[in-house]
Amino acid sequence: MSFPRKFGTAIHAALSFIVFFFLDLLDAILCVVYEFVDEILEENSTGCYCTAAAPQSQTTDENELSSETLFGRRNIFRGMWFLGFAREFKSKLSRKLRKSKIHQESVNRWSDCGCKSCKSWTKNEDGNLHVVVKDSTSREYSVQEPSENVIFIHGFMGSSHFWTETVFEHIQKDDYRLLAIDLLGFGESPKPRDSLYTLKDHVDTIERSVIKPYQLDSFHVVAHSMGCLIALALAAKHSNIVKSVTLVAPPYFPSSVEGSVLNRIARKRLWPPLAFGTAVMSWYEHIGRCVCFIICKHHKIWEWLIKLCIGKREIHWKIKDITRHTHHSAWHSMHNVICGGSKVADEHLETLIKSGVKIHLMQGDCDQIVPSHCSGNMKRTFPAVEVDIITGADHDSMISGRGEEFAEKLESIWCSC
């Protein structure tokens, strides 16, 4: 490595240390602030993970467990004396203020959006996921069941739009029933405050909302990013009826310690900007909640401003999807699915391969979110997995920018099963 490159790397490391040192302090202060406001505004406030200890597991099912990264994020300021003094003062003040406060329990936290659109899921009494179905079976044969069912699972901070707006229109064959879901906590699906959004929670809701009501006796699964880990868990549980699993840009870190997964996905660094944003939202619970409060709670204002700037009545579905979650659902899905789910991915892959399920992986060579070596690691560990590297594609554009080509590839995979 040349001297200028070494010097630049050293400067970047130093600046990253300074910035994240400041963010550690800010998050520790915000911890006390949010704790104070929550106790005043909420009847049953939910505690954070800053001082919580990891609970003793009562189950051997790894899919059901909370990730260790929720409890093990180091912050040197959490035990400082001035924060202890602040908490003591906060407790006395909040007790006085709570006496004169009449609480009304809400499905949302005060820092979440309570607009009609964001609370529409509360009208769904059965608690099932939002499912978009495209049944392309010809009308004259509508009495027959489609020969192929396909479940589409989106990634982090996405929704069923990721598939319906890009791929569905290009799949024209008459024997496919396409089912795109909004995962628990995202899009138009329920966002319960008492859920920990573990792999088991996601799999159970898909079973209850798709597999059972649509009586699927066989199906294919197509998933993107975080959805790949959920797809593997779902397919492994139903390995006797699943035909194929297509993984697009899966965050695969074989047999890793969960903290190591967090460091790989969201290493603390300033550059590139996308990596910095990922690190902030993954490491700092309270700063992340501030971001969600500013952007998600006030998404109507931001959408109005964007419409004003671009001069259009409607804004792109990707922009809308970014705000259609709560901090609670995004935070827990990030840690319990991406970090916690990584350590059971090998187990799920082994189950599928032993059952003879066809597994196909696709990833863009310009992906800056999921490292390109993830696909190589999976291929080395499981040679039976078919891998396609898409030249010039990044994390999303391999689908959103190549819908027709991607649909043709999917149909070829399904036909080969």
From Swiss-Prot:
Expressed in epidermal cells. One of its GO terms (biological process) is cell wall organization. Its EC number is 3.1.1.-. Residues 150-259 form the AB hydrolase-1 domain. The keyword Lipoprotein applies. Keywords: Cell membrane, Cell wall, Cell wall biogenesis/degradation, Hydrolase, Lipoprotein, Membrane, Palmitate, Secreted, Signal. One of its GO terms (molecular function) is hydrolase activity. Induction: By UV-B. It comes from the Eukaryota. The active site is at 154, 225 (nucleophile), 367 (charge relay system), 395 (charge relay system). Pfam families: Abhydrolase_1. Coiled coil: none annotated. One of its GO terms (cellular component) is extracellular region. Involved in cuticle development and morphogenesis. This is Probable lysophospholipase BODYGUARD 4.
